[in-house]
Amino acid sequence: MKIEPVQVEEAARELYIRALKMLPPDIKAGFARLDKSETDATAKSVLGTMIANIRVAEDTDNLLCQDTGIPIYNVLIGRDVELDGHAIKAAIRRGCERATRDYPLRSSVVHPLTRRNEHSSCGIEVPVIHIDFSDLPETLSIEMVPKGSGSENNSFLRMAIPAEGVDAIKTFVVDCVIAAGGKTCPPTIVGVGIGGTSDLCIALAKRAATRPLGSRCADVDGAALEARLSAAVNQLGVGPQGLGGDSTAFAVHIELAATHITMNPVAVNMQCHSARRARATFTPAGVAYGF
């Protein structure tokens, strides 16, 4: 199956706009679950406002949030897919620029030193593009995640040592959620990366934060720790928008990697309540959009 750059460009454009407008079904279901279980009156009111915002965005074909975020594209290439990797990256950038200028969208991307905004949602190394491979035949998947600054500004890394054990990981994650408070626009998805090197650990935390609700860590011990941490975080009383309540997080997600015998890095990356993402899947039958 051959994929032309123009197809990727159009998908990149469409995905950015879709991600900013339509919340995935698993996040909507997460809101319904929290709204049903929340016992604090103020928190329940805040959740109601968030749910109403989702409805208004859908009914009026508007954005879910004013923050268009840092555009992240995760590309997964299956077997028997023919494409030009360099051309694909350029096509994604063009699609991102077109979405920003044609819609138009607010560009949130600036030069890190001069703070100059090119009004394209693009810049040095942005959009962020990750490319990986899968065993699926004749399939190309492109996931788009617009990562907002409230959640991204509250990212943490600790180079723990093995002697501190799992309890140190739990304490660190809980402390990070407390430190973030309402700045991440909770309820959040708390992504936790454990193991690897510092850079891999942070990447794992981001991957965990953008996983669909209801998914579990593939490792049985990791999945058990997810459940314990989710319970611990939701006992903190941070609540929606940091105003108190039971609903601090939709879930805690964990991704693991093997690490050095003298290391045990742990990273936290959170996703705000507007946990936006969109996906395009190319097959011989065409392109299908979803989440």
Tell what function each PLM region has.
Residues 1-192, 197-291:
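Non-transmembrane, aqueous-exposed alpha-helical and coiled segments at domain scale
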